[in-house]
Amino acid sequence: MKYKLIKEVDPALSPIQQILLNRGIKLSDMYHYLNTTDADILDAEMLGSESIKAAAAALITAVNNNLETLVLVDCDCDGYTSSAILINYLYDLFPSFVTNHLKYYLHEDKTHGLSDCMDYIENNDFKLIIIPDAASNDYEYHKILKEEGRTIIILDHHEAPTVSQDAIVLNNQLSDYPNKQLSGAGVVWQFCRYLDKIRGGHEADEYIDLAALGNCGDMMSLRSIETKHIITKGFRNENIKNPFIYGMAEKNSYSLGNKITPIGAAFYIVPFVNSMVRSGTLEEKEILFKSMLKNEAFKMILSNKRGHKLGEEEKLVEQALRTAVNVKSRQTREQDKGMALVEEQIEQNNMMQHKVLIFLLEPGQIDPNIAGLIANKIMAKYQRPVLMLTKCEVLNPNTQLLSMPPKPVYDTYYRGSARGYSKSGIENFKDICQNTGLVEYAEGHQNAFGISIKKEYIDKFIELTDEALKDLQSEPLYYVDYIFKGVDVTPETILDIANLNDIWGQDMDESLVCVENLKVTKDNLTLMSPDKKPTLKITLPNKISFIKFGSSQEEYEKLLSDGYIELNIIGKCNANEWMGNITPQILIEDYEVIGQSKYNF
């Protein structure tokens, strides 16, 4: 087990100051960071004064003239929340227009942008098409739609080569907007705030919870002051007004506690939306999206719950929440099947001899929509980079030159998801893959991206990545904020760190601490709930408890001795509240045995 201090500990700093400094927050900025206000929300016109005026004018024209309007819902959590903000906001102002002249389109799969819905658009008389969270670079489709006399408004945050000449584009990446860590939901919310400004209203404030969830869903950086304020304010209990978010918080109240935090949303709300997008039917996706709409969520619909009576009804949002849980369970079962398949390949093909685990799958073996999730799990379990690739046949562009008369010639590629393993020190896995010169493409983030490799290059790719990663350590490297010695760790420090729970999220990693040379004896070691959920507990005289979930009788007995066993422990700080009492805990992530004695003096 390897661990390393993020920065040398400055004894003059409080735990809060040390941890914020370790995450790139300057001492002079810390008070502001912890106490953001509405003054930290940027002026929406910074998205482009002329563009935002044009977008508002196009929307107002559509409303005033009852023009048929389409909202294209992008296929992820940010896309769903972006579109929900816009439709809810417009319903507040123009309920008749939304009811009679506005439609939305849900993708059947994980396709982004306009490519799969052009036929639908062209078969309908939509004059205005609004696309939140997507399509900034769909230039050819913009041109086609404009030539057909349709107006397109893009409300996006994705990078693109240039601003489209055939659409009205609001995009923080393509403008002078200072905050590049604002998601599509944030851009839509800012557009609604601009509409409030020109008409003298405050309706956009009602949807900051959706903006918060969208930013969490797209993993926007919490180092951004504006983004942090949107998320912090949006998740305050008094601002949770969206039926879906409120319902998910209630369903997951045991895990979330009495409030939604960024990391809580990322673990207990966002995955239910993303699993629906990946694994839900179109009907299931629609009911989830409707549960985010105030004019739909509380409608009474026929119940489909087990054991319902004929004709029994329930609120749409209640059915949506239950459906989201069921789809997530269904996806988990598919993940488990996929895990079993690829783990069998690891053993059969002796794959652990290589630095990158490359799975070459046949079509249909694993649903492409969950391949990335399985890659994540394999990466974490086997502690090395993963490529989860499926074979596909691609028409050779030079077919007509290869034979007379020409016959179709296909090249075999393997395409899919790549995941790097940052805990081993790899921060640039995408670059490593590209530097082989053998990939057709590698696009996305450094440690989570899509990749394509021609079949004939696979063996050479394995050879080159083995060489590039020859120094890769298979065991994880934990970056910790503090290294404590045995019983020197204090309850106050653990609780101070635990109380930072509200700030953990993207680029504000949850704090890890190391406790070295901790002596475990039969007097301070307990196995709780051994028959149901075995949980290891080590209790110090100062009342700090070390907790390891998912333990076993076997693990307990290995640590049990008449003397003592000495451990180094990596863990997360937690404040456990029970019956009004708060006690400090360290939740064990990993540990190693470094010594033992038959005697305990």
Stretches found by the model and what they are:
Residues F484-I544:
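Accessory interdomain/linker segments of ATP-dependent helicases and helicase-like nucleic-acid enzymes
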Residues E68-K127:
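Anionic-ligand anchoring segments at beta-strand to alpha-helix junctions in alpha/beta enzyme folds, i.e.
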Residues I16, L21-I25, V63-L67, C75, ...:
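A structured phosphate/pyrophosphate-recognition subdomain
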Residues M1-L72, D92:
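An N-terminal, well-structured beta->alpha segment
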Residues K143, L222, P243, R278-E283, ...:
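Glycine-rich, acidic loop segments that terminate in or are immediately followed by a histidine
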Residues F449, Y457-I462, Y556, I565-F601:
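OB-fold single-stranded nucleic acid-binding module
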Residues N376, P541-S561:
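Beta-strand/loop nucleic-acid-binding surfaces
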Residues L20, D74-D76, L128-I130, D156, ...:
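Divalent metal-coordination and catalytic microenvironments
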